[in-house]
Amino acid sequence: MVEPVIEIEVVYAAVDRQVLRVISVAEGTTVRAALMASGIDAEFPELDLISCPLGIFGKVIADPDARRVQEGDRIEIYRPLLADPKEVRRLRAAKAAEAKARNQ
């Protein structure tokens, strides 16, 4: 018997470009297995597909090795943050306070 096949998308936004791949996988495939089947690692060898954070439609997946993909899912590969948002806000506030003090 032939397993039903579903179509999903795999997306990654690198610093310099974005890639969206539409692939077909067997129904019941896990998120991690679908990601590996996409072949995106050949285009971005710096990606560690085993441990990189993943999401579907903006929602982080806690266990991509257990979560099954569904028809039409968009698997998103997340990059690490370049700067801690809290630290950036703190620096911005300090800079604004310094500018305000100079103007008084």
Curated annotation (Swiss-Prot):
InterPro entries to which the protein is assigned, alphabetical: Mopterin_synth/thiamin_S_b, RnfH, RnfH_sf
SUPFAM superfamilies given in the database record: MoaD/ThiS
Gene3D superfamilies linked to this entry: RnfH-like
Protein family (similarity comment): Belongs to the UPF0125 (RnfH) family.
Alphabetical list of NCBIfam families matching this protein: PRK01777.1
Protein name per the record: Protein RnfH
